[in-house]
């Protein structure tokens, strides 16, 4: 099985420059990689989900969004391939506490792999971003604890592994490591470090790609890591490969590069 995760940059720049070619670039990468699951962050209803090529529209020939009734406000959507997995249960919730436009949230699903009958839970999430006070750091830990509560509920009901994908706004940055650290304390494993084949690359750039002549080009190389894929009940899966997709196309699509995780259910 395969997951594609990316913060696709909500972008509140001048109207007409919001998305341009970026959704198309993201679609091309997804259709080339062919993941079972696509997790997004900053999927802004007013930019990424609107205009001539809304992300949900250009993916719909191959992918279905869970809880589409929340599409008008869900910045962290989760899409799946119905030909390979089916939904057993799913949900969406914005985090309590500090939030902006309810963009810090989680979309989740429990899925059955059709070829094996085995279950896996997948979550797309985005933690609080500010770094102005100790309360901001505490908010990211609260975000992690909300995910922990969900993980324990799903484990009790379905007994399957959970894979959490997203921008935790945590790392060797001004935000600090709190959100990521809390996830590890809860019992999540960073798949970067448990995969048979792995990539130690950065995931995010502090500069945005350039808008020029109607499209985005020349994205910078990443220089920090705040995006992660983490597994709960990791012993129930075989982590085969983790990598950061760093190409001219991926760098032009967002300030965050896609994370790809290949795994098998045990």
Where are these regions (language model features)?
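Short, Asp-centered acidic motifs that coordinate Mg2+ and/or phosphate
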Residues: 1, 36-37, 120, 161-163, ...
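Acidic/histidine-rich helix-loop elements
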Residues: 5-24, 96-100, 128-139
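N-terminal, active-site-proximal structural segment of metallo-dependent hydrolase catalytic domains
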Residues: 1-57, 74, 145, 264-266
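Short catalytic/ligand-binding loop motif for oxyanion handling, primarily in non-cytosolic enzymes
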Residues: 11-14, 46-49, 73-77, 88, ...
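Structured beta-strand-rich core segments of catalytic domains in phosphoester-bond hydrolases
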Residues: 19, 37-129, 241-243
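Active-site metal-binding loops of divalent metal-dependent hydrolases
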Residues: 7-8, 43, 125-127, 167-168, ...
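His/acidic metal-ligating clusters that form di-metal
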Residues: 108-110, 114-123, 136-165, 170-177
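Metal-dependent phosphoester-hydrolase catalytic domains
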Residues: 152-163, 170-266
